[in-house]
């Protein structure tokens, strides 16, 4: 009997507990009239946060948590019309508004629902003049070799006996590897920062980072000096790993020797090898997938040297706001002597914003008064419309939420603009950081280059540009095609997922971007006028064309065999009467006769008129005609004579393929 009573009591207890849980669950279930769906979504995202405790070791779990918004690798499909989608959604939003739908605030907040909210608490940096910053070295940096060559970034000039070896190394690697190999991998460098940078104090609760370096057939000492400089000048608690992506190199020193060498760092440095040549762009996306330990991804080119206290200023803005992407100030390492100097241009402090002309060539323009007014001190980070692309830092998850790089971009070129536009137009910020400086070696003339693999096809960079403008420039893309008319018929693949990304994230228009962020671009590079005609300028019924021969800024154009490949033989004449090639104009030389090519803006060298039916170019200021000597291969102007066959020309369109 006692057994039955105990069994009954236990049964009643279980049933009662179950009913109590049901009542509690019902009380917590959201009702249809719940006023804060945004809050619930954010709470759910926090619960699923793969790095909920950022104040700890900051190690991210497996890569299955990170899925690109844009499918990767590249898939082909069909282009969609973003404007038609916008019009349809606009009509839908208006219907919701009239029907008592969401408030304008709710609609604006939707832009950020696909990005994880900021959960990391970080205090703003504090400037304390005269008090050395908490991340500044307390003692002068030790040299790699006392009194050694290249220490303190002083130039190393070799004698004439090294000339042949130097030329061979430049041809193979793009740098003077003879000098580089003589310089310590741990050499000391000069400090090019403003004095004020030394007195910034940063919250020590910084995010950790994975440094990603992509290389293809890089010289040994320039690559390893990049790695050594990062390890030497980065506080160890923040450096989660250095990830090297070997993009299908075939140099022997980048195989077993590299594998053995990096064992010195007990797993801190890792190398992953691509099974085929992917190109710099997609290799960086691969690097993001392989780098799993750091909260921030820092991309460096394979021939850099980070400077003193580079890390804290670069990562601090990201620690405060995860949608900020930062770029260090890039100094120039001379590829011959390895001296480090500030990059030219910019304002009186050497500060510049990243920009472009309408043919999509990278430019630097001085910091504007408006941007200066946004800062309290001259060493604070400042806004830039674009980055050069080789060196930057971005929160890892945010980069994945942005979809990494467009998977349709190939090898190199245009990716710096694509990621810049994507960040700005979709709710992020791009900041240049004056107190974080990194030296970079630029390839020297005479380098043989790294040709793209056969599977890529021709004109990969131009195709990249077309993809970028088709996705991000909206109606401004017409200005690109005015500057690069040969690209109008260029196939650029499927961009439907990229446009869907823009729509899903309520990314702003390029017009907004040009007015609010890149407002100074048109003052330096005015919108180009329409073209009257474009193509090769061929001597009428001949096989000879005008060729710039790669000359710029004052060189004379010549006559050469027509090759139908564009490039140095591609010109355009616009409604402003300018005869142009990229950002260069044709004009008469100092002798008043020979025709030269020189840099111009839209207010210069409005000198030419093309009479298509007459096959004639007239030089307006002189009233003379464009002429040629097929014997001397010269191009000049002379008195107009309708009987002279050498004054007859035709422009034939050339389309890139």
From Swiss-Prot:
Membrane topology designation: Single-pass type II membrane protein
EC top class named in words: transferase
Entry annotated with the keyword Repressor: no
InterPro entries: GalNAc-T, Glyco_trans_2-like, Nucleotide-diphossugar_trans, Ricin_B-like_lectins, Ricin_B_lectin
Pathway membership, UniProt: Protein modification; protein glycosylation
Alphabetical UniProt keywords: Disulfide bond, Glycosyltransferase, Golgi apparatus, Lectin, Manganese, Membrane, Metal-binding, Signal-anchor, Transferase, Transmembrane, Transmembrane helix
Region annotation (Catalytic subdomain A) ranges: 206-317
GO cellular component: Golgi membrane
Membrane spanning stretches: 7-29
Record GO biological process: protein O-linked glycosylation
EC numbers, comma separated: 2.4.1.41
Positions in the Lumenal compartment: 30-657
Compartments, record wording: Golgi apparatus membrane
One Gene Ontology molecular-function label: polypeptide N-acetylgalactosaminyltransferase activity
Region Catalytic subdomain B, annotated ranges: 381-443
A Pfam family reported for this protein in Swiss-Prot or TrEMBL: Ricin_B_lectin
Cystine connections: 197-435, 426-507, 545-562, 585-600, 625-640
Location of region: Disordered: 31-66
Cofactor entry: Mn(2+)
UniProt family annotation: Belongs to the glycosyltransferase 2 family. GalNAc-T subfamily.
Protein name: N-acetylgalactosaminyltransferase 7
Lineage of the species this protein comes from: Eukaryota, Metazoa, Chordata, Craniata, Vertebrata
């Amino acid at each position: 009997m006692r057994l039955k009573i105990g069994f009954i009591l236990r049964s009643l207890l279980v049933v009662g507990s179950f009913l109590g849980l049901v009542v509690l669950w019902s009380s917590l279930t959201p009702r249809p009239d719940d006023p804060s769906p945004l809050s619930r979504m954010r709470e759910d995202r926090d619960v699923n946060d793969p790095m909920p405790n950022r104040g700890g070791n900051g190690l991210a779990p497996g890569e299955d948590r990170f899925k690109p918004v844009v499918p990767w690798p590249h898939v082909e499909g069909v282009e969609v019309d973003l404007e038609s989608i916008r019009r349809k959604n606009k009509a839908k939003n208006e219907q919701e508004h009239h029907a008592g739908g969401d408030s304008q605030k709710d609609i604006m907040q939707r832009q950020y629902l696909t990005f994880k909210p900021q959960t990391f608490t970080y205090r703003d940096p504090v400037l304390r003049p005269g008090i050395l910053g908490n991340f500044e070295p307390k003692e002068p940096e030790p040299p790699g070799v006392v009194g050694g060559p290249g220490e303190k970034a002083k130039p190393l000039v070799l004698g004439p006996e090294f000339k042949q070896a130097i030329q061979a190394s430049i041809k193979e690697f793009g740098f003077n590897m003879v000098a580089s190999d003589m310089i310590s991998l741990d050499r000391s460098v000069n400090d090019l920062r403003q004095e004020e940078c030394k007195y910034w104090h940063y919250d020590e609760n910084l995010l950790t980072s994975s440094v990603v370096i992509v290389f293809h057939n890089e010289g040994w000492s320039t690559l390893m000096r990049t790695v050594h400089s990062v390890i030497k000048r980065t506080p160890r608690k923040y450096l989660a790993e250095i990830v090297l992506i070997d993009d299908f190199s075939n140099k022997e020193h980048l195989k077993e020797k590299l594998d053995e060498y990096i064992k010195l760092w007990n797993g801190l440095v890792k190398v992953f090898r691509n099974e085929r040549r992917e190109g710099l762009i997609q290799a960086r996306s691969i690097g993001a997938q392989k780098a799993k330990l750091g909260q921030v991804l820092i991309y460096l080119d394979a021939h850099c040297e980070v400077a003193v206290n580079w890390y804290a200023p670069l990562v601090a803005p990201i620690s405060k706001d995860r949608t900020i992407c930062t770029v260090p100030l890039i100094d120039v390492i001379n590829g011959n002597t390895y001296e480090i100097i500030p990059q030219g241009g910019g304002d009186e402090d050497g500060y510049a914003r990243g920009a472009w002309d309408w043919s999509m060539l990278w430019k630097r323009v001085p910091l504007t008064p408006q941007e200066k007014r946004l800062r309290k001190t001259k060493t604070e980070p400042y806004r830039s419309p674009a980055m050069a692309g080789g060196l930057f830092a971005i929160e890892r998850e945010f980069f994945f939420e942005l979809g990494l790089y467009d998977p349709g971009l190939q090898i190199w070129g245009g990716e710096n603009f694509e990621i810049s536009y994507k960040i700005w137009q979709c709710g992020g910020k791009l900041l240049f950081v004056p107190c974080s400086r990194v030296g970079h070696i630029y390839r020297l003339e005479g380098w043989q280059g790294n040709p793209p693999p056969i599977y890529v096809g021709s004109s990969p960079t131009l195709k990249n540009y077309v993809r970028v403008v088709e996705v991000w420039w909206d109606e401004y893309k017409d200005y690109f095609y005015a500057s690069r008319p040969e690209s109008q018929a260029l196939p650029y693949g499927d961009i439907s997922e990229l446009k869907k990304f823009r729509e899903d994230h309520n990314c702003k228009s390029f017009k907004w971007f040009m007015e609010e962020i890149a407002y100074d671009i048109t003052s330096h590079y005015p919108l180009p006028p329409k073209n009257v005609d474009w193509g090769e300028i061929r001597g009428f019924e001949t096989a000879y064309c005008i060729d710039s021969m790669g000359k710029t800024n004052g060189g004379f154009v010549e006559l050469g065999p027509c090759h139908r490949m564009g490039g140095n033989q591609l010109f355009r004449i616009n409604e402003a009467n300018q005869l142009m090639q990229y950002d260069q104009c044709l004009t008469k030389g100092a002798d008043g006769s020979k025709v030269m090519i020189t840099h111009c803006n839209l207010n210069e060298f409005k000198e030419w008129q093309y009479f298509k039916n007459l096959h004639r170019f007239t030089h307006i200021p002189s009233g003379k005609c464009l002429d040629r000597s097929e014997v001397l291969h010269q191009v000049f102007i002379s008195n107009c004579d309708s009987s002279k066959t050498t004054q007859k020309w035709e422009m034939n369109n050339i389309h890139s393929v």
